[in-house]
Swiss-Prot record:
Interacts with GLI1, GLI2 and GLI3. Interacts with SPAG16 and KIF27. One of its GO terms (biological process) is regulation of DNA-binding transcription factor activity. The gene is STK36. It comes from Homo sapiens. It is linked to Ciliary dyskinesia, primary, 46: A form of primary ciliary dyskinesia, a disorder characterized by abnormalities of motile cilia. Respiratory infections leading to chronic inflammation and bronchiectasis are recurrent, due to defects in the respiratory cilia. CILD46 is an autosomal recessive form. No situs abnormalities have been observed. ATP binds at residues 10-18, 33. This is Serine/threonine-protein kinase 36. It is found in: Cytoplasm; Nucleus; Cytoplasm, Cytoskeleton, Cilium axoneme. It is an enzyme of class 2 (transferase).
Amino acid sequence: MEKYHVLEMIGEGSFGRVYKGRRKYSAQVVALKFIPKLGRSEKELRNLQREIEIMRGLRHPNIVHMLDSFETDKEVVVVTDYAEGELFQILEDDGKLPEDQVQAIAAQLVSALYYLHSHRILHRDMKPQNILLAKGGGIKLCDFGFARAMSTNTMVLTSIKGTPLYMSPELVEERPYDHTADLWSVGCILYELAVGTPPFYATSIFQLVSLILKDPVRWPSTISPCFKNFLQGLLTKDPRQRLSWPDLLYHPFIAGHVTIITEPAGPDLGTPFTSRLPPELQVLKDEQAHRLAPKGNQSRILTQAYKRMAEEAMQKKHQNTGPALEQEDKTSKVAPGTAPLPRLGATPQESSLLAGILASELKSSWAKSGTGEVPSAPRENRTTPDCERAFPEERPEVLGQRSTDVVDLENEEPDSDNEWQHLLETTEPVPIQLKAPLTLLCNPDFCQRIQSQLHEAGGQILKGILEGASHILPAFRVLSSLLSSCSDSVALYSFCREAGLPGLLLSLLRHSQESNSLQQQSWYGTFLQDLMAVIQAYFACTFNLERSQTSDSLQVFQEAANLFLDLLGKLLAQPDDSEQTLRRDSLMCFTVLCEAMDGNSRAISKAFYSSLLTTQQVVLDGLLHGLTVPQLPVHTPQGAPQVSQPLREQSEDIPGAISSALAAICTAPVGLPDCWDAKEQVCWHLANQLTEDSSQLRPSLISGLQHPILCLHLLKVLYSCCLVSEGLCRLLGQEPLALESLFMLIQGKVKVVDWEESTEVTLYFLSLLVFRLQNLPCGMEKLGSDVATLFTHSHVVSLVSAAACLLGQLGQQGVTFDLQPMEWMAAATHALSAPAEVRLTPPGSCGFYDGLLILLLQLLTEQGKASLIRDMSSSEMWTVLWHRFSMVLRLPEEASAQEGELSLSSPPSPEPDWTLISPQGMAALLSLAMATFTQEPQLCLSCLSQHGSILMSILKHLLCPSFLNQLRQAPHGSEFLPVVVLSVCQLLCFPFALDMDADLLIGVLADLRDSEVAAHLLQVCCYHLPLMQVELPISLLTRLALMDPTSLNQFVNTVSASPRTIVSFLSVALLSDQPLLTSDLLSLLAHTARVLSPSHLSFIQELLAGSDESYRPLRSLLGHPENSVRAHTYRLLGHLLQHSMALRGALQSQSGLLSLLLLGLGDKDPVVRCSASFAVGNAAYQAGPLGPALAAAVPSMTQLLGDPQAGIRRNVASALGNLGPEGLGEELLQCEVPQRLLEMACGDPQPNVKEAALIALRSLQQEPGIHQVLVSLGASEKLSLLSLGNQSLPHSSPRPASAKHCRKLIHLLRPAHSM
């Protein structure tokens, strides 16, 4: 503080105080912001530090400059530029500004925001109060308390920051947001400057949120078209369509007026917000936004407010009612828990409620807000507080609304229709009524009032009394609106349970169907229509879903569904429903019920749909024939309800409702295989009826394919039935009218309500026909160009994927279509980059992208298209493809999320998204990679060796046991699992098959080692692949183990973890009829025996001995017809015999086993002889009891001393040397072994053979007889000449290793030493 003079306080807020000051010894006027540290949490202090760090690096003429910051014992002091005032003061004084001044301010705000966004900084609290006025009329942006500097790994945020009046729609809905939220706020500020009020203003947070989300902006006539267009771009509710960078800079309203500050290149901050994201990053951003999207549809802002209001209402209720009413409430409440559905005849509960519990509040709070105009915003306390400070739980406040404490409960009048109308208005889901629904739910008196009204008025209705209908209809409408408007499923279900819903409703419906006198009343139709609306709203509630937080609601839902299904047949057969409204409403309610069933547990949905084939089959057949009987004279099954009017005399509502209900029964929701299991039998039943020779149902449904309203629903019905019935596919493939209708839909010649979805279903339908029939229905070959046009020119991702699926099927049948490479690559890139909206399960349990991947594979593997692979591998599509696959697999990423945001890191998901890419699609994608890398092998090296390679991460993940278990359980997963595994192994073999830089290869090995790929390969072979397909994984495993010691340890540790299972697999694999597999395994085992200690080798001994320890496996391997197998077996024995006493004992005790070992010495194959001589040599070393048995091998080994293979000569020399100390000197002398070894030592051309011979002679000369022979042969003289030859070598040449052994042997042969 010694640097500044503090002059006067100029502002005060929750943060602290702001003083005007002056820097000592200068005329510089500054603002000093004193922020107390006392009482602030660690989080608040961290946020303050972050704000200071952000401001410290900002240098822009339109952003307040932080000059200094420091701390005292009690405060943090921030020193900034001194501003002349706030922009908000101008609004206070002048109301609004001329457009030219707004234009100048707009250019400066955009300039400041461009600077922040180019540095990846979000302000997150743009409002007039945070815009200061500088000297000369300029503006400066300040208050960076909510600002966030986003790292390169951060794509979107979700934490609620800012002031509600200026919050964007995605922010108030708590959806992930990005920098475009700041741009929305700029639009609000500029609108307020020009008009005098914000574009959305309300004194209630509930009303404000609704306005922001739903209401259009009202445009005064005084705004110029250019300015209006500018604001329209900024105030676009969809952030993806909002005017943003870089287009914002070039808008005519500010073009040429924006100052762009250029700075020297600094550290790489990632892609600035002012530039368009590359496709691969856009894919990541979309995926992250999808992952972090809220699971419910309730904003946290409103949730907190609802909670406050509920607490407030209960608190005031207790204050005003006193102990007596509290006691009465306790005795009148329904006991919690799940009780049997209440019947209408039950005795009504006593109720102390008086009318108008909430009517007074309604009148005082909402009636005055009923005008459609935006109220002028009073300047005092006009802005809602910041959201983080708006709802402090410890200080609940009333948002200007009256509550139940102002109602005189003791002097209320009885119920009136007018009061129910007020309640209806209260629960209507219109912008100004967001508060009341939860208020009603939290009021127990309202719940009892509803229950009482239903009981009392319901009893009157059943007696045909008009007064009962007049009382119950308003209650119905209030209930319907309440069930539709409230999103708090827990509170809503609790209310329904307490009020006796849906039991009372369904009881009313049942009794009304049994009362003939009631059905004669003139008001009966209106009563049923409103009752059906309430039941439909109940079935649509989210607490009926399996994912609901309400545990006992599912049982109530199941009972209600069964009751409704019991009544549906009668409802559809009502004789006096001349207006068709009851049938329509019943069908709509049934459709909603089916949709709720689809999201439920397998047990509940299966029971429901199964009943349509048993006890409720009359409903199912009635629906099917109700659509077709009026048109054609068909036979209706006995008992099936009939629609009483011909279809041609009905409105379009009934056939539309019937077809919609049939589609709801048949169509399986995406990603819910359990639901399809339940519906499959229903589709079988319908398909069987459609395939009957005498049935006219099929032609009737086909004729509806060209009807604007029926088309989409009937397409779904026929498609679902064809999924289960090949016979129906054949019949439809031969129906000219069906094919013509489908072709016309593709060509856009049929006017339908939803062309996009209808076309998508048609494309999949035709794909299914080709797939099932394995040939082209007549005329389909002409569709190639139409479908290709849809694929390359549609911007709807689901259409692109569906068109690709059909093109792939057509291509397999030989249909040609003209696709330009640049066009189909662009189409594929768009489809893989944009968010996927999966509306229908493709045929064959395929994923959303499967058809696209199969088509790409076809296009790239056509003959003469090799150049396309090069173009594709260098395009954006290649990168986007692997990013999309990574997201489908839900791979974990490497950064951490903070403060409610989502970065590139995300916890790994337990299950891949099979709805996007199925096992078949994965196989196609890996085949595409194989084709690409075969053509462009260097691309493979760069993809796999690059640090953090997404492709390498994918390949490693595909070998993980957890993923393979998921793959095996996926639809058709077990079928494609071997293809996936083998493709991955082929791709991982590329670096070892190519000439790769040593450092890069080391990196690849380290990557595979760190992910325990060696262990995973062994587990894959053992648990997931048939024996005939393990050859390639074992080969890769062997390569890894031979090159990397850690991978070898992983192999051994995996065996130790599950010895019984894995040893069993290895035993079978060793004795398989696949020589390459057996050879690789033997090589792996031999390397293990050579490198690791004896404690790790017991499993190898077990493998060779067999379960009965007869060494049958070893005998089989030693006698194997393949040379490579025998050679690797001898090599393995050679390494084992260095350590294993058990194997030495077996050679001695097991009959014929040693003979098999020695038989290898005479093998025709030199490699086998070499390995056999190595094994015999190690058997001879310290042979002990085995020594005499090896005497029979001396002649053979002596003969091999003349073998042309140097390795064999070396091994045999060593073996013979090992036999000397074992008491076989006589046999060695008989075969003239000393003479032969001496000749080798002096004359063999290979130095290593000479060395082995000299070492053998040193060992043998210890036998007196052999020593004497060597002396008699003049060995010393001969060896001396050899030694002299070594000494004559130039000094620069290294001395051979044999020289040392030669000198020592000469010394040992001297007479003095001999004595």
